[in-house]
A protein has these predicted regions:
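Active-site helix of classical SDR
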Residues: 124, 159, 167
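Residue(s) in the substrate-gating loop at a strand-loop-helix junction
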Residues: 144
Length: 247
């Protein structure tokens, strides 16, 4: 198992790629703190089922990531478990409305950046302080091909480009305390974020992909598990595209 004996913190774990991350990481032997925004009985039942199936513990932790006080309280819950934090996956994110550049307001930008970038930075600051105590760790930031290509909404693309830039800076700085930092850039993935797209836009996107289909969330999660594992011990500061051959 890729992650046997490791403890991972995954944000945005209630649905989509984050839910797949919790399942795949548990399958690969990791214990998981599964961060989500609001309490949900079905979410907790799913975590309990996965924990029993794979013989690990998975604990739900609820907080609004953009609320600094709530986030610090969530990390106090993590620290109360007295288990080392080995892996952080910054997965939480939102996409926002589909607007043209000229129609995107500063308010739109702030709302997306607060969740997709600033919260990611604050989570990383808190998590890597814990990792640094053991002089080792791995961070996987979930970016997007939109942050590379700039072909999506302005606010979303800009937020993911910022995640990529931060990944490189974090990698340079944190390697001194044994922490690797990489970004994973998914392409067109079958999640709630893209379910509302029109059939026309969906077909346009699929037409750019050599594999002619959306990614499954578990396919993205599998690559994240590799980057978090010791199998990727010589990989840091990189952006891994997982896009089915998007040209």
């Amino acid at each position: 198992m890729l992650l046997e004996g490791k403890n991972a913190l995954i944000t945005g774990a209630a649905r989509g790629i984050g839910a797949a991350m919790a399942e795949v990481f548990a399958r690969e032997g990791a214990n998981v703190w599964a961060f989500a925004r609001t309490p949900d009985a079905r979410f907790e039942a799913r975590l309990a089922m996965a924990a029993g199936k794979y013989g690990v513990w998975i604990k739900p932790v609820y907080c609004e990531l953009t609320d600094t006080a709530a986030l610090k309280e969530a990390f106090r819950q993590v620290m109360a478990d007295k288990q080392p934090l080995n892996v952080l996956v910054n997965n939480a994110g939102i996409m926002g409305e589909d607007r043209m550049f000229q129609m995107t307001s500063a308010e739109d930008m702030h709302r997306i950046m607060d969740v997709n970038f600033f919260a990611m930075v604050e989570v990383s600051r808190l998590a890597t302080r814990l990792m640094a105590r053991n002089k080792c760790g791995a961070v996987v930031n979930i970016a997007s091909v939109a942050g590379i290509e700039g072909d999506s909404r302005l606010d979303y693309s800009a937020s993911k480009a910022a995640v990529i830039a931060a990944t490189k800076k974090m990698a340079r700085e944190l390697i001194s305390v044994g922490i690797r930092v990489n970004a994973l850039a998914p392409g067109f993935t079958d999640t709630d974020l893209v379910s509302g797209l029109s059939e026309k836009v969906t077909q346009e996107q699929l037409g750019r992909i050599l594999m002619h289909r959306k990614a499954r969330p578990e396919e993205i999660a599998g690559v994240a598990a590799f980057l978090a594992s010791d199998m990727a011990s010589y990989v840091t500061g990189q952006v891994w595209r997982v896009d089915g051959g998007m040209l």
